[in-house]
Amino acid sequence: MQTLEEHCWSCSCTRGRDKKGTRLSTWLAQRAAKAMSSLNSLLSLAYHTLASSEGRSLIRRSLVLFAVGVFLALVLNLLQIQRNVTLFPEEVIATIFSSAWWVPPCCGTAAAVVGLLYPCIDSHLGEPHKFKREWASVMRCIAVFVGINHASAKLDFANNVQLSLTLAALSLGLWWTFDRSRSGLGLGITIAFLATLITQFLVYNGVYQYTSPDFLYIRSWLPCIFFSGGVTVGNIGRQLAMGSSEKTHSD
């Protein structure tokens, strides 16, 4: 009799476990089906977005901005390595790739994000441009930006305060000459703060090193370079967006 009761109890427990296992399997299957359905919807949306003219334009602008960021990172790195070097000997040219390999791709990615962000914020705020943009103005902005970086590497200043004030004045002059928008000023300051913070964190942890060992010197010019770089890349992104919109309307 006791054996029969134990057998019945074990059978009921087994059936209970089977029911729980069945419910759990059913619930997991339903969740998996919902997840697959959501994934298919996202993939379909991404495909249709990329297949559209706006999606193709976004990809083209991203690639151009990435290439510009990588190129500027290599050129500006060479200018910093070249401090107090007047000629271009082979050993100096070879040092253009002496930086960490991940720096140019990171700069390219940052340039793509910033360049796409500027026209989006302009469109969201509805802020009108102060003047008509053209590629000649954008090229002059790039030249001034490279000149500011070159000045920070070549010119000798009495102290860090003088260096900071000079580069800050040049950076604000670049913004006033080629931008003059509140969104450009705000984004430039935000980019300068965040990029300087991230860079100093990498230097502090030994992930990245500068050619100059003077930490105070580096800290004094770095925010100005990031600010002017953000304004420059933003102007490139705006010009690319304007060209893409004009081409879309003409089509």
Swiss-Prot record:
Pfam families linked: INSIG (PF07281)
UniProt keyword terms in alphabetical order: Cholesterol metabolism, Endoplasmic reticulum, Lipid metabolism, Lipid-binding, Membrane, Steroid metabolism, Sterol metabolism, Transmembrane, Transmembrane helix
Keyword Transmembrane helix: yes
Description of how the protein assembles with itself and partners: Interacts with scap; interaction is direct and only takes place in the presence of sterols; it prevents interaction between scap and the coat protein complex II (COPII). Associates with the SCAP-SREBP complex; association is mediated via its interaction with scap and only takes place in the presence of sterols.
Function of the molecule: Oxysterol-binding protein that mediates feedback control of cholesterol synthesis by controlling both endoplasmic reticulum to Golgi transport of scap and degradation of hmgcr. Acts as a negative regulator of cholesterol biosynthesis by mediating the retention of the SCAP-SREBP complex in the endoplasmic reticulum, thereby blocking the processing of sterol regulatory element-binding proteins (SREBPs). Binds oxysterol, including 25-hydroxycholesterol, regulating interaction with scap and retention of the SCAP-SREBP complex in the endoplasmic reticulum.
Family indicated by similarity: Belongs to the INSIG family.
Descriptive protein name: Insulin-induced gene 1 protein
Gene label: insig1
